[in-house]
Each structure stands twice: as C-alpha cells, then as structure tokens.
Amino acid sequence: MLRLSLPPNVSMGFRLVALVALLFSHVDHITADTEAETGGNETTECTGSYYCKKGVILPIWEPQDPSFGDKIARATVYFVAMVYMFLGVSIIADRFMSSIEVITSQEKEITIKKPNGETTKTTVRIWNETVSNLTLMALGSSAPEILLSVIEVCGHNFTAGDLGPSTIVGSAAFNMFIIIALCVYVVPDGETRKIKHLRVFFVTAAWSIFAYTWLYIILSVSSPGVVEVWEGLLTFFFFPICVVFAWVADRRLLFYKYVYKRYRAGKQRGMIIEHEGDRPASKTEIEMDGKVVNSHVDNFLDGALVLEVDERDQDDEEARREMARILKELKQKHPEKEIEQLIELANYQVLSQQQKSRAFYRIQATRLMTGAGNILKRHAADQARKAVSMHEVNMEMAENDPVSKIFFEQGTYQCLENCGTVALTIMRRGGDLSTTVFVDFRTEDGTANAASDYEFTEGTVIFKPGETQKEIRVGIIDDDIFEEDENFLVHLSNVRVSSDVSEDGILESNHASSIACLGSPSTATITIFDDDHAGIFTFEEPVTHVSESIGIMEVKVLRTSGARGNVIIPYKTIEGTARGGGEDFEDTCGEPEFQNDEIVKTISVKVIDDEEYEKNKTFFIEIGEPRLVEMSEKKALLLNELGGFTLTGKEMYGQPIFRKVHARDHPIPSTVITISEEYDDKQPLTSKEEEERRIAEMGRPILGEHTKLEVIIQESYEFKSTVDKLIKKTNLALVVGTNSWREQFIEAITVSAGEDDDDDECGEEKLPSCFDYVMHFLTVFWKVLFAFVPPTEYWNGWACFIVSILMIGLLTAFIGDLASHFGCTIGLKDSVTAVVFVALGTSVPDTFASKVAATQDQYADASIGNVTGSNAVNVFLGIGVAWSIAAIYHAANGEQFKVSPGTLAFSVTLFTIFAFINVGVLLYRRRPEIGGELGGPRTAKLLTSSLFVLLWLLYIFFSSLEAYCHIKGF
C-alpha cells in the first residue's frame, strides 16, 4: 500500500487551508472603506453567492435556497461526487500517460558509415526527451487543468470564468511549493538528488515565471480588462517557442555550434586545460530512411545526432554489462532457482534501478493508489508466467499436432566399407496414431555408385497403428581397392494414409492424405569410409566457436579415407589470447588410440566460465604425427627400408621375425614386424614388390588438412540471449503498455498488492491488503469503463491517446460543474474553490508520482525538473487556447473579450514573487554544504520544506483575502 508520508508542517498546512477557506466563505460584512468604494453590487462579488448557475453539463439543483441541513447534504454529495470524478480522471490519465510513454518510446533505425568505410546499424528515439517532457508529458500530467479552462470558456458562451484560470494558477502554486517541499523532505537523511539537465531546468524555470508575468501584462498593463486576439494567440505561440528554447539548451546548440572546446593535459599533474579552436572535420555519415542526413558532423546540429547515437550505444553497452552483472550475482545468490525465476528477479531489479520518465511515475502512483498493484512486480511476474506458458503451449502443440510427419531420425549416417549393411531409422511424429501410414524410399548415387559401392535399394515402409519408428537397411559392398570416402542418398516420398491394411500388407483404401506429410529431414546422406587405409586424421574444421558456459568442450578428430589398424594420435593445447592454467581453459594433452575400424575420437578440454556479456578469446588444439601401432605383415615389411633389424627369436609360418625401432618423430612407425626368408639388405625389390610398397606407403596414416584447431571462446549464447531478452523487456513502454482488450479487462478486475517496498529485491507479488481491496472496489467502475479504451498497441499508442483525452475532457466538464456547485452551495467563490479544492484534486496523482520519483530516481529531474515546464505549458496551452478561441469569437462578432484582472492578476503576481524565492532556494541548495536540490542534512531539509509550505500557505491566505476584498487587488 502506497502511503504518502507528509512532514508535520505540510499536514498542518492542509488543515490551515481548510480553516481559511471556511472562514472567508462565511464573512458577512466588509470593511467600511471597501464597501464605500465598491458599492452594493461589489458586495455580492466579495462575499460570494449562494445562488448556483447552470453548469456546462449539470443542471441546477432546485430549490436554490435550501435549508441548512439540505445545504450540508448537497455539499456532501457534490464533494463526494467531485472526489469520485477525480479518481476517474486519475485512472483515465493512467491510460493517457501509458499511450504517451509508448508514443515517446518509438525508435528509428539508422545506418552509420564511419571514415574507414565500416557501417553499423543502431536505433535512436524519434522523440527528444526534453521535447516529449514539455509537450506530451506535460499535456498528460496537466490535461485536466488545461481542458477545464477550455471547456469553461466554450461552455459559457465564450465568457471568462474564474474556475479554469484559477485552477491553473493554483495547481502551479501547489506543484511549485507543496510537491517540491515534499520531494525535499522524503529523500533519506544525508542523501541528495541533483537536477541532471540543469540548462533545461533554467530555461523552463525562466519560461514558467515569464508565463505568469505575461498573464499579468495582458490583464493589467497591455489592455486592462480586455484580452485581444493577438494577446491570446501570442500566449499560445509561446508554447512552441518555449519547447524550441528548451531543446536548444538540451542539445547545446547556438554558442556551442561555433566554439569547439579542446582539452589537454597541463604540465602540472592532474591539471586539465581548456581552450577553444576549430572543430575537426569528420566524415561520419548517417543514413536515415535511405537518405544521408549529414556528410560532416559539424554540418548537422553540432553533431547532435552523432552524439545521441554514441551516447545510445554507450548506454546500451552499459545496460548489457549491468544486466550481465545482475544475472551473475543472482545466480550466485540463488543457485537453487530456475532460470525463469532468475529472469524474473533480474527483470524486476533492472526495472527498479532504471531511470524512468515522469509518465511512468504518474502511472505507478495511480495504480498503487487504486489497488492495481506495483506495475514493476506485476510485469516481472507476467513475463515469467508467459515464458512458462509458452513453453507448455509449444510442448502441447508438438504432442497434439494433427498431421503425421514422416522423416529420418538423422540426416547423415556414416559406415565403414566392411560393415555389410547400414541401418537407417525412419520416424513418425504427430497425427492420429491409429491409422496406417505408408512411405516409399529409394537410394540415389552420389560419389558412391550402386552395384560397386552399395546395393541399390527401394521399397515401401508401413507404419502400423501405434508404430512410431521403422528401420531400413542398405547393403554396403567391400573391396580391397584404396578409395576416397564416398557417399550416396536415400530419399523418402509418396506418403499415404490408410485405415485398413490386408493381411499381406497391401493397401485396401487410400484417403485423407492431407493428414500426413514428409517432415525434415526427408533425405539421408550415407558416407562410406574406406577401410583399406590406415586413415587421414584431421579436425572437422579449422575454427570452432564455443560458449564459455559449455564447461567441458568436446572436439572430434576424424579418421577418413580408411580405418585399418590401431593408430595413436597425439594432441596438446596451445595458448593464444586465452590463457591456460585454469584462467580461461585448462591445459590438456594426450595420445588417444584409434582402434581398428574406429573413425572418430573425442578430445575434451575444460573451459572456464567467467559469465561475461562479451568475450572473444582464442586458444589452439594441435594434433601431432599419427603412429601406427600394428599393421599387416606384408605391408609392414614394405613400409620399412631393409637393414638394421634385430632378430626377435620368434617365427611366423616358419619364418624368422625381425624388429626395428625408430625415434618418436620418425615418419615410420616405431615398431614393425617383418618376415623374411633370406634377409639381404642389398636385395632389390621386384616391380610387383615395388607396386605393393607404393600402395602400402599410400595406406600409411597421415595428417589431413586441419591439424591445428583454433578455438574461439565467446560469451555464453544462452547467457547473452537471456540478457538481450531482458534488455528488451526492460523497455518501460512494454511495462506500462497493453496489447489487447482482454489484457485490459483482466487487469481492471484484478486486485493486486499496492506495497511500494522497493527494498524487497525478490520482486515477487504479495497478497493485497485491506486498503487495496477497498480502493479496488471504489474504483472498479472506472477501471472496467476505461478498459474499453483502445490498447496502446494500436496505432503506436495514438488510438489510446485520442480516446483518453476525450474521456478526460468529459470528466473534466463534470468536475468543473461539481466544483462550481459545491462552492456556491457553501458560499465559496469559484476562484477560491479552484485554488484550494480543484487544484489539490488534480495535483494528487502528481504528488504521489513525485514522491516515488524523489526516493527512487538517481536525479531530481523526474520529480521536480518537470514542474517548471508543466507550469509554463499550463498557461500557454490552458489559457492560451481558451482565450484565443474566445477572443477570436468575440472579435468576429464585433465585441471584446473581457476578463476581470482583479483576482487572477493578484494571484499571478503573488505566485511569480514566491516562485522567484523558490527557484533561488533550489539553486542555493546545490552548494557543496548541501549538495543538491533534494535531500541533504535533516536540518536543511526541514528548513527548506517548511519555507516552501509557508509560501504556499501565504499564497492561499493572501489570495483568499483578495478574493473576499479584505485587501485590495489590481
């Protein structure tokens, strides 16, 4: 449950406000001087009226002069209805802000061509952060105030009212003083929060103060009591001008465009010297939408886009490294958890630490208040559930596939020339296993030929009901001729399905062929290894990539072109950029022995897992010269040069056996067995023996093409994939957005825990509290109603944006009527009602959002940085649009649009003076003794928040005095 912990001075301030409002609402007399000056007609304006006027939507509650008890009842009804409408506005504003978050999160892919010709692709946000904060974000947080002003003017025959403008000024005062006071106070003692984009804050603060100064000018100086068309239009056009100025400050344009600062190291240690000079030429080209948008960096907005791209790349890399670090820590901390649980924890932790927009905090605050739960925890849990459910769905789909698929178990088979036959397995998966399936097979020549290397084979395989695999055999022909490795193919074709089979296996009926088909692989490749050669030994490929998480990597040493005899093949690991000795891998060496007819041997090397997001290190595995352990007697004799033999004293077939020993690196085997009748080292070989010797030499084991394997250790594919998926899931637009109406209705009727305990790193959802249930049932009507709003998935959020702002406008019209009727029922003027009650009601969600942002965010921009910009936007849009429409309407009718300058001009002037004090204090707090706009030592916090609350109380107090004519206004 989200609790707004207010400092004592703030809570006491709210009580004083209520007391002041009630006090001035029941003043029955005015001072003699004031009454003499104003006369009887002004007395009614000073004291307020108990006679209500017809609203834009709501009619007058008759009779107009009820009893005291009826007044209390009516006031209660109006007040409760107004509060309930505020809840509705908060919930639809939640949808509205979600659409804004999705809209401003849109990205565009660009191609960057570097001077060396290398091209890279990256994405940049379409919306600049500052521009989005001053336009859509400000509109989202201030939509009720802006629309109230427009609706009030348009709904009352284009005449000026007190409710809309006073709400804008009152809301600005509440934001500037109370929200900032709360943000200063809630930061833990000793911690500080600074504004990151200080230039933007200066610009928006200046425009905020100028906006209210401009209001005073057009009300009391330029044309007192009359708003002309040019004044209204200029007020509105100040809005885009303000946005452009803020964007310029954010992008460091203008002066920065022409002056390039360079930095060099001074002679003194630690000294950095700055000097100005020409910007170096750059030929980095950026291609967007197929067009080169700049050929030189200095010709494109001071390289703003290049800087943004570079910053984005750095941010992405930093995010990946941070995600990898978090996953590694969580795996060490929770070794018992499954990967889905670890992903959920990491997702929640990263989302909690990520810098968030004003829109997100507004949405989070609203959902916590209304029992919709912690959006981050819900998102993390939903993602974990989706991952598990998708896995189950895929498994179920595989098991319940309505189509029978026929395919080979594997696509490649190997056999020796002397194996006799090779067995191939055909599989049946999916479909109705109660039927009989037929499939034809047929061999086809490759480099191996039928009749000389293998037996041509064709036929039909029958899968009877319940059978899921069958085996076919193809005969292999052996010869004594040395040959290269050869291969041939076996194809599957013509799948048929039948329900009945005769006793002799003949198909009785053939139907429903659409429920069976060939799967993959439907062709098998059989490789025949020659067995008349000792073998050629090689790795499969010269380079292999392995994941650092593989643990024990296995490398195959292949024996091709023969497999006769026992052969020893030595190997060893060699360091490259990867280090042995257990740092990146463990040093390994050995001498595996290939047995007769054995064609594959596996070498195992242990790889050390560092769990790095990016890794690219290499080492090598090298095989040495193969050594023949045993050969046929005749070939052994022919392989060795005659001479230097040692008589063993043994005989074979009546002939003596000799042995000759060579060094380890000699190409001839170390030990051979020879047979000779009459040994003569000078005896020449016959031509037949020479031919046999040549053939035997060809059959000697040799090394093949790939004797040195380069092993590239890369980051874990699974680990990197998990990190990348989490990076995508940590897009806040995905967190706050919705994909379907079904999702919205489920969310609307679901109660979730509103606990805002972000220290709980588990990120797991908790059970809802009693407060969560109460708030849910109070707001379930609004939740279900606004679930009909289009999801943010449609039109990239614009459909939700349009419908939401229409709903906010409708509710705002009700709020304006209820507030006006509430005020006239108890005798409060519209200006006082707007400044106190309406401004407070529209600012409550922003108050909670700022409080959460102040405690969670690293900087103060999200909590108070947008307050000044929002205040300026309120004037330029809320008053600028409304007064422009009214001024144009009256000018078209030959009339003047009259606005009483008294109360509004006084409030504006008072607010402007206090705003100067507020901004000055905030800037002073950046001094080293405090360290930032928010937080700091406890004494400084209390003094600052007390001062700001006092400024707000004084603003309410003096505005009320002026409204009831106790002090003279303008």
Swiss-Prot record:
It comes from the Eukaryota. One of its GO terms (molecular function) is transmembrane transporter binding. Ca(2+) 6 binds at D584, D610, E611, E612. Keywords: Antiport, Calcium, Calcium transport, Calmodulin-binding, Cell membrane, Glycoprotein, Ion transport, Membrane, Metal-binding, Phosphoprotein, Repeat, Signal, Sodium, Sodium transport, Transmembrane, Transmembrane helix, Transport. The cytoplasmic Calx-beta domains bind the regulatory Ca(2+). The first Calx-beta domain can bind up to four Ca(2+) ions. The second domain can bind another two Ca(2+) ions that are essential for calcium-regulated ion exchange. Belongs to the Ca(2+):cation antiporter (CaCA) (TC 2.A.19) family. SLC8 subfamily. This is Sodium/calcium exchanger 1.
